[in-house]
Amino acid sequence: MIVTYEAFGAKMFGGSRQEIIFSKHQKEIGKPAKWLSVPLVLTSNTWENGKNELSHQDPSLAESMLSETSDISRVLFPADYNSAAETLTQLYQTQGQIWTLVIPKRKIPVLFSMDESKKLLTNGGIRIDWAGHEADTALISLIAIGAYQLLEVLKASSRMKECGIAHNVSYLVEPGRFRVPRNRGEAEYITSETVFNDICLPSCRHVLMVSHTRPELMLGTLQPLWTGRSVKALGFINKGGTLDVEGMNFVNGCSWAHILREVGKLLSINEEVVFSDLERQVLNGNLSPDGVITKINNKEI
């Protein structure tokens, strides 16, 4: 197991890529590598490492590894204790792969049961049945990639439920399994059509995705989920500083309030329906978010 803080991981890409290429070549000639798959753990991650400002806020390694062939270079975003434990259980049953695992170092609520975690890892993603509102008829799907992103999506979902806005919530732990396969090996790892349809139900016309990474990468990688739908993607937009997690979410436009604002745009809902006057002033840059959007209960994630 290799463990590093996420920003330093960018320096490790060159060597990791050579191992991926060699393992891929072995697989293609029918002599797959027999070494036990290696977890490359990226923690003290982009959204929680405010000690050294923007220099230590960089999701580049996960992005680069996701660009490599997904049957050898597997990139996962475990969201809590159970999904992280299940990730390691499944990882050590494979050979010849590098698993890049983006994992928070801070305490995260247990969001998935053990059974849900197995389903999540087996399929690469899951629709969260206990979240959302009137999901079967919802016109919009909220999709999170990354633990802190899921927490903000769930906050937005709670407000949407209060306002009677139908929606469903899903989590993708392994985005590479939802891409258009670029080779035969990747095609073997793509998740089933049933999972695709469960995450974006037939009634869904819009998708709001929030990613740990820069949003552009996921927009390209997850093309099959967007087909025939309007989509808005949020994620890291190179803004940072000596901020806590909620502060990072806010400056990068990934807070629950920013998510809710984009949902309103997609569904043509007036902001006055979902926001208070104070919240709208914050989103318009006229007030500090503290105590309104962030740090509502004097708690930091």
Language-model features: locations:
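Hydrophobic, small-residue-rich alpha-helical packing segments that form membrane-like cores
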Residues: 67-68
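Alpha-helical scaffold elements adjacent to nucleotide-binding pockets in ATP/GTP-utilizing enzyme cores
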Residues: 15-22, 64, 90, 156
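Thiamine diphosphate
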Residues: 33-38, 43-63, 91-301
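Loop/helix-junction capping segments adjacent to catalytic residues or to phosphate/diphosphate-binding pockets
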Residues: 9-13, 85, 150-151
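Inter-helical turn/loop segments and adjacent helix faces that build the functional surface
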Residues: 29, 72-74
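Acidic, glycine-rich A-domain
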Residues: 57, 77, 83-87
